[in-house]
Amino acid sequence: MAHAILVGEARKRSLSIDIYSAGIRDFSDQPPLIETSSTCLHYNTPPPKVRPTWVGELPLRSIDRFLVMEQVHADALESEFGIPADRISLLGEFDPKHRGIEIDDPFFSYSEQTYRKSYELIRDCIIGYLDTADELR
């Protein structure tokens, strides 16, 4: 969802930035999650691409900022993929309502309400990031 939200918000601001989305575990052979797609559609956000992407498939050296939901994701980017800590940010750090720096993955909830709350939190954090990110100026 974060990728879909960031693409939409960047487009609203006419930002010309490359946006990638990937997991630290390889689920590239799995279909997109129905819950993610239906939540995005509920908020009139085009849903994510056809299949999940694994971080190892990305052009890692060319990416300036990695936004992650949980510290475990940041740790994996550093230890498994050699990404310097100064290029990684917890998305929750940009939450204007300060609800916490980590955002729980709604996957295991299987709950429409949880997915919608996650969407709204992620959207708020992405807007906060876009409003404050020095690398976008």
Q: Over which residues does each language-model region extend?
A:
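Short polar/charged helix/loop
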Residues: 1-137
